[in-house]
Structures are given as C-alpha cells and as structure tokens.
Amino acid sequence: MTSLTRPRVEFISTILQTVLNMGLLSLGLILVVFLGKETVHLADVLFAPEQTSKYELVEGLVVYFLYFEFIALIVKYFQSGFHFPLRYFVYIGITAIVRLIIVDHKSPLDVLIYSAAILLLVITLWLCNSKRLKRE
C-alpha cells in the first residue's frame, strides 16, 4: 500500500470539498423552491374557510421556518469558511419538535417528553453560546 503525498491529499480534499459544496448549493436551491411552494400553500390555507385550517396554518408556518432555518444553515456554512455551527442544528431541532407537538398532541405523556427534549436542547444552546464554547 503506497502512502499518499501531501499534494495528492490536498487535491483529493479539494475535489471532495467541491463536490460537497455543489451538493449543498443544489440542496439550497431545492429548499428555496420548497419555501416558495410553502408560501403559496400558506396563502391558500390562510384564506380557507374551514375550522381545521387554523391548525394547518400553524403547522405550515413551522414547516416554513424549518425550510428557512435549513437555508440559513447552508448560507452560514459558506460564510463561515465551510463550517456548520452547532447552534443552527439545535435551532432546527427545537423547531422540529415544536412542529411535532403541534401536529401530534393527543398523548399528554408524549407532549411532556417532547417538552423535556426542547428543554434539553435549550440548555444545549445555552451551553453552546457560553463564553467558553463560543467560536464566532
């Protein structure tokens, strides 16, 4: 087995980084399209006369924020020199669990467990934003 030379390792790293960047750029564009579709869907739900449309509107808003947060995560990745900040994943996790509570709130025990998960994520966010762990 031959060992890789430094220039060859850097070349492979550059190729893989380019593939990753192109994939994330493609994902970002797809998410922008979905964000546009969700905007149209929210406008339809907003003017729907049914009573159930209120829950659908709130669920749609949370899904909208999930798309928005994923797009913001991709933008931050490129702005911060190809690095994903941990706190953005925590924001996405909190929003996703809030959406889950809104959609599936039949079992009080499940809602309590989801709420505990949100509390754990908020504590994680607090720790990530503390002076010792903050990178930016």
Swiss-Prot record:
Pfam families attached here?
PsiE
Q: Which GO terms describe its cellular component?
A: plasma membrane
Primary site of residence: membrane
Instruction: Tell me which UniProt keywords the record has, alphabetically.
Output: Cell inner membrane, Cell membrane, Membrane, Transmembrane, Transmembrane helix
Subcellular location(s) of the protein: Cell inner membrane
Q: Which GO terms describe its biological process?
A: cellular response to phosphate starvation
Topology with respect to the bilayer: Multi-pass membrane protein
Query: What stretches pass through the bilayer?
Result: 15-35, 55-75, 82-102, 108-128
User: What family name appears in the similarity comment?
Assistant: Belongs to the PsiE family.
Please state what the protein is called.
Answer: Protein PsiE homolog
Source organism per UniProt:
Enterobacter sp. (strain 638)
Gene giving rise to this polypeptide: psiE
